[in-house]
């Protein structure tokens, strides 16, 4: 029976009960914080690294935008852990689902727009018309900028989904090729295994980079509206 490479992206079921929600909540359960307990060196190093990254990403925000730091940090951790846990064998990658990524992108994008319209409506509306636009082109520029604005959450969700899905499909194809070559071509199987090892390292980097890019774009949208 031929294996479908896209079966790994289907929602897992247990006794005909979808367990996708449970897999999405696993990264949240891994984030445990108890101020009464002192962390070890690893947790201290991770906390310091996370604080350094978030401070560098949000240092250009206004004081009102700094209030988003906790939400953005939680979002970064959730996407990062979902991407990394999805690299484990026999696991479900929740960030490979466009529905989940859009469920994260659309509310956050809408929140930045609402924040800008309530606090700086004139500046927010001014983004619809670039400065110095010729008078005859003003209606077309407004339409183009509006479409560009509406495409932002779609770009956020599709970018994350496409990168995670492409990486998993490539790993599936290389690992299947390695398995098929083990009994017939040992040399080729070793070469493809080395390729798979390098690909796993690349996917670890992609998992971290995509979480960083997703949150960074939200911060840039927030910076425009605060």
Swiss-Prot record:
Major subcellular location class: mitochondrion
- Record bears the keyword Transmembrane: yes
Q: Which GO terms describe its biological process?
A: proton motive force-driven ATP synthesis; proton transmembrane transport
Q: Which reaction does it catalyse?
A: H(+)(in) = H(+)(out)
Keyword Transmembrane assigned: yes
Keywords assigned by UniProt? ATP synthesis, CF(0), Hydrogen ion transport, Ion transport, Membrane, Mitochondrion, Mitochondrion inner membrane, Transmembrane, Transmembrane helix, Transport
> What NCBIfam families does the record tag this protein with?
ATP_synt_6_or_A
Identify its protein family. Belongs to the ATPase A chain family.
What is this protein's name? ATP synthase F(0) complex subunit a
Give the species: Lycodon semicarinatus
* The organism's taxonomic lineage, starting at the top: Eukaryota, Metazoa, Chordata, Craniata, Vertebrata
Question: Encoded by which gene?
Answer: MT-ATP6
């Amino acid at each position: 029976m031929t294996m479908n490479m896209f079966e790994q992206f289907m929602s897992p079921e247990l006794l005909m009960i979808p367990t996708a929600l449970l897999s999405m909540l696993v990264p949240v359960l891994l984030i445990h914080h108890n101020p009464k307990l002192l962390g070890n060196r690893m947790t201290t190093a991770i906390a310091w690294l996370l604080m350094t990254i978030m401070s560098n990403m949000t240092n250009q925000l206004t004081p009102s935008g700094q209030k988003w730091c906790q939400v953005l940090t939680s979002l970064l951790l959730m996407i990062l852990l979902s991407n990394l846990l999805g690299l484990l064998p026999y696991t479900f990658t929740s960030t490979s689902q466009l529905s989940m990524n859009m469920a994260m992108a659309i509310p956050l994008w809408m929140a930045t727009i609402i924040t800008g319209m309530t606090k700086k409506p004139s500046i927010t509306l001014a983004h619809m018309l670039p400065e110095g636009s010729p008078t005859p082109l003003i209606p077309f520029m407004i339409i183009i900028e509006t479409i560009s604005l509406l495409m932002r959450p779609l770009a956020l969700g599709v970018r994350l989904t496409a990168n995670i899905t492409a990486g998993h499909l490539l790993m599936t194809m290389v690992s299947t090729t390695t398995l098929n070559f083990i009994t017939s071509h040992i040399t080729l199987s070793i070469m493809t295994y080395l390729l798979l090892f390098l690909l796993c390292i690349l996917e670890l980097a992609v998992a971290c980079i995509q979480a960083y890019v997703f949150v960074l774009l939200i911060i840039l949208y927030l910076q425009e509206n605060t």
